[in-house]
Regions:
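A short, conserved structural fragment
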Residues: 89-99
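Short amphipathic alpha-helical interaction segments
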Residues: 74-86
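Basic amphipathic alpha-helical segments that dock to polyanions
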Residues: 1-2, 84-90
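Short, amphipathic alpha-helical interaction segments positioned at domain boundaries
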Residues: 8-15, 110-124
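Short alpha-helical segments that sit at the start of domains
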Residues: 22-58
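Minor-groove-contacting beta-hairpin "wing" of winged helix-turn-helix DNA-binding domains
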Residues: 100-105
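Short helix-coil junctions and helix-kink-helix linkers
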Residues: 36, 68-77
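Short acidic, hydrophobic short linear motifs in intrinsically disordered regions
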Residues: 58-71
Length: 124
């Protein structure tokens, strides 16, 4: 019965991609895909964080030092603590209470974030 109800609902259509906004988001990254500066707009922070999330190997456990190294390799404003905290607060990364162990949370990024990830990786 639950499956039947689900089938009867109209399919959810994702919001169209705002290509002007996507172009603005690419300005936060250099030609090598490294994040240059922290966005002041909250709506720009999330897609940029998804880019870093996509570069964390899935199903692996990282020490604080290891995740810092991965983050530093992918951003140029040298604030891995900010990035760790934001990714944890937004449910992209989980960490132990003592902050020693981190793991990427497997979730589907937003359509804008997915498009940005593909664009920066050269897959668009």
């Amino acid at each position: 019965m639950v499956a039947e109800k689900r089938l009867m609902r109209p399919a959810e259509v994702p919001a169209p991609i705002d290509y002007v906004e996507l172009q603005r988001l690419t300005r936060y990254f250099d030609v090598n895909g490294r994040w240059i500066r922290w966005p002041t707009k909250f709506s720009h922070q999330d897609p940029c964080l998804w880019v870093l999330w996509s570069r964390l190997p899935p199903r692996q456990i990282f020490s604080e030092r290891e995740i810092n190294e991965l983050l530093r390799a992918n951003h140029l404003f040298d604030d891995p603590a900010l990035l760790r905290r934001e990714m944890t607060d937004r449910g992209m990364v989980r960490r132990t209470l003592d902050g020693r162990v981190y793991k990427r949370v497997e979730r589907r990024p937003t359509l804008t974030a997915l498009t940005l990830i593909r664009l920066l990786s050269g897959n668009l």
